Amino acid sequence: MKTLIIAEKPSVGRDIARVLGCKQKGDGFLHSDEYIISWAIGHLVSLKEPDDYDPALKKWKMHDLPIIPTEMGLRALPKTTKQLNLLKKMLTSKEVSQIICATDSGREGELIFRYIYQWANCKKPVKRLWISSLTDAAITDGLAKMKDGREYDNLFASARCRAEADWLVGMNATRAYTIKCGELLPMGRVQTPTLAIIVNRHHEIAAFVPEKYWEVKATFVTENGEAYTGMYFASAHDTHTGQMETVGDAALGVPLVNDDMTGNGTPRAASPTKTAGIHLADAETRIPSETIAKEIAAKVKDAPGKVESIETEEKRQLPPQLFDLTELQRECNRVLGFSAQKTLTIAQALYETHKMITYPRTDSRYLSGDMAPKLKPILESAPAPYDALAASLLAMPTLPTGSRIINDAKVTDHHAIIPTGSKKPLSALSADEKAVYDRIMRNFLAVFHPAYVYDVTTIITIAVEERFRSRGKTDRKLGWKAVYSHEKNQKNDKAEKDSEDVVLPPLIQNQPVTATDTEVLHKKTQPPKPYTEATLLSAMEHAGRFVEDEALKEALKQSGLGTPATRANMIEKLISSEYIKRNKKSLIPTEKGIRLIGIVPPEMRQPETTGKWERGLSRIAAGELDDTKFMDSIRRYVTYLVGEAGKV
C-alpha cells in the first residue's frame, strides 16, 4: 500500500519528491515503492456556474434573481480536467491507503485540496503537511510533524463559506446592476469597497479648496560670517496676535485634525519641542496674510538679533519589523516602483523556484519560537554583499530576538518572510528577482541591529521681537540604517522629515547675529494625494480606520480588506474591469468606477460588510460559529442587494 501526497503545484510536488527519494516519473506524478506524489495546478475544481444548475440562467434576466442554489455544487475546470481525473483515479485507487494534503498552508490551499478530495468522493484518512519553507530541512521537519487532516475541518468550513459567499454576492450583484445599468459592472465583497476607497479619495481631492498662506524665511549671519536660515513662527510673544488670532490650518478655514488635534477637533496633548515656553508646531510658521508676512520680512531685514535658545534632543528610531506580504509589496512599490502583483509574482518565484525565501503569502511580521535556532545558520550563509553585515551580527554574544522579532502569539498560518539560507548564487536570479531578494535580505539583517540614534538641534533666533526657528539633525549611531547606507534615499526616513535639516554652524546662547536677508514664501494648502499601490495596500490592510463600530473595527484590524495574497490581484481586477487606471504611480478612478459607487447601496461599498464577514469566518475557523448560520445571513443579504438594484 502507498501514501498519496497532493501538492498545490508541480514544483512543490517535485521538491517533496526529492526529499522522499521519489525518482520514478509518470505522466503528472512521481512515485517510489512507498509514495505517489502528484499535484494540483492551482484550482482544479470550482463552484458551478448558474447555467450548470439551469441552462436558462445563461441569459441574464432580472426576474431570475437572486440565484441562490439549495446546495452549492462543484465543476471541473476545463483546462485542467486531465490532471483532475488523474488525481481522482489515484485517490480512489486500491493501491493508496493514506492521503497527505501538501497544498499551501492556509485557507485557500485547504480549499483547493478539499474540493479535489470531495470531487473524487474520497473517504480515506488524510494527514496535513503544514510548512513555511520549501528547503529540504523544512520539508523533512514538516513530514515529521504532520497532523490529522480532521484538525483542519473548521479551516475548510471557513474557506468554503468564503468561496460560496463571494459567489452568491458577486454573481447576483454583478448581474443585477449590469442589467439595470446596461453595462458590465463586476462587483464583489472586497472589490467594491476597495473601489469606494479610491473613489472617496477622488471626491476629497475634487472638493478640496486650496487656501493661500505665507511663510517668512530669514538668513542670519554671525560675527564670524557663518550663515544659517530660520523660519518665522508665531509664539506667545507674537506682536501680531491681534491680527492673527490663530496660525495654521484652522486659521485658513481648514480644521487642523491630522497632526495637532484629535478627530473631534479637540487639541491634542502638547507634543512639539518646547523652548522658553513656546510650542514649536510646524503649522505655526503659516501666516494667513501676505501683508503681515511682508511687514515681518521688512521689519527683520538687516536688523540685529541674537540666538535666544539652543536645545538638542536625542531621538531614537527602532529598526523595521520583518516583512509580511503587504509590507513587502509596499516597500517594492515605494523603492522599486513595482506593482503589488509584480512583487507577488517575483516573491513566489524566489520561494518556489529558487528556494531562497520562506512562504511569501503571509500576514505575519513575526517569527515563531522554534525559528530561533535557525537564524544564525541563515546569517552564516549570507552571500556577498550581505556577508559583512551578517558577520557583524554573528560577532555579537547573542543575537537580539525580542518580542518585535519572535512572538508566537502573533504568528498566524505562516511566519514573516525571511531568507532561507540557500547557497544558490545571486547570479541565478534575474535583475528584478535580485532587487526583491535584496529588500528581503536587508530587512532580515536590519531587524537585528540596534536603533538609529540621532540628535535634533532646535535654535530660536530673535530679531526685533520676531522669532525664527532653525533645525538641524546629526547622526550619532547609524544602527540599523547602516544596512541601507548604500542607498541615496534612506529607507523609512520619517526621522529626517521631522526636522527642517538646515546646516547649523557652531552657535552659543545669546550670540549676536544679523538678519542679512529675508524672503516671503508664497504657499497654499495641499489636497490629499491620490492613492498609490503602496498607500492603497495600507488602506486595505487597515480598513478598520474607516469603521466606527468597535467590534467590526477589531475584525478588520485582524484581516483588513482581502488577504495579503489577494490584494494585488484585486488591484489588477479593478484595472481590468476599467474601474480604475494607473497614472504614473497613482491609481485614479474612471467615470465607470465613480458611477458604480454612486449607485450601489452603502452596505456594498463600506468596509463594515467585509468586517462582519471576516469576523464570522474567523469564528467559523475557530469553531465558534456554525457555518449554516453564516450562510443564512449571506442569503438574506443577497436578496436585499437584488432588491436595492431594482430601485436604480
Predicted features by range, described:
Residues 1-2, 102-105, 182-186, 312-321, ...:
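Conserved short loop/turn motifs at secondary-structure junctions
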Residues 72-79, 85, 94, 134-220, ...:
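C-terminal or mid-to-C-terminal helical accessory/interaction module adjacent to the motor/catalytic core
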Residues 276-321:
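Metal- or metallocofactor-binding catalytic centers and their adjacent structured scaffolds
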